[in-house]
Amino acid sequence: ALLAQNPYGLDFGERVAFLGASHPIHSVTADRSEFIGRHGTTEYPQAVLGGLALSGRIEAGDDPCAVVASDIDIPAGGDVTLSWLLGDAATPAEASALVQTHRGKDFDQRLADNEKAWRGFLDTIQVETPD
């Protein structure tokens, strides 16, 4: 997974953001100009159109973004399901643990677990009024 932190951020400077995937990641970059390219656009980034491997460039001071690239083989007549994991955590270790936990789960199971957790939180208090 690609982890990022902005210690200069006033509100969430201590948090760690992450971008991971359910499938192997082959290259990454945090340089927006590398991804979009000189003549590309956000709709048609040159790195995607050219099938280019990303450099792994992750440096402060650039125009930041988070890009992960993977080579995916889709069999003739087949399909492939891809999931990306985007979130934040208190520490890099917690971010890595979240990615590992969710990378191995089926997407439908993650949705069911998420709904169960929210139901446990939201259904705790019930209010009845005469109106």
For every predicted segment, state its role.
Residues 5, 46, 100, 109, ...:
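Residue-identity detector for glutamine
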Residues 104-131:
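An acidic-aromatic substrate-binding cleft motif
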